[in-house]
Amino acid sequence: VQGAVTEHSLTMAGADRAESAVVLGSQQIEDLQGRDAKSLMNSLTIKQYNPDIYVCTQLFDSSSLTNAELSRADEIVVVGALAGGLLSRAALDHGSSRAISSLVRTEEQGVIYRVSVPVSWVGRSFGALLEEAKTQSNILLVGIESSAGDLVLNPPGDCTLGELHMVAVIANQRPQL
């Protein structure tokens, strides 16, 4: 839905029963901080309308992160920081931007997914599960997220998975573990 985020537009969009919402910055607002402020206000409006909806918000300026918590958005993606990081990686490791970019484009093979740790993996080491996950499910384990939300990419092989952990995997489709 484009345009103003109002109770009427949220009702028309079905936000009362939606699982997720994505808030994109308005290209009509040239000032990046103004654009981000509008996005954060829209996020807050959506959360007030439906507190259970998962809101992902696009920001353009990392300095806007200081106000992001007020918006109650569940996830914030700072586009400027992503582009800057991608460019710096490409300058340091020629060609790496193709691999990184392909992981976030859904039309590509091999997308990053965040999935719950299966019961059969609880108490086992990350290293022991690498080959098993690849051979049995054709997925590549790349990280572990703790119950506190801390993400560790490429953790040590002896890192043990717990029942409240999530794993970051690369797969051709969402794995059913």
Q: Where would I find each of the regions flagged by the language model?
A:
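Cytosolic regulatory regions of ion transport systems
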Residues: 1-177
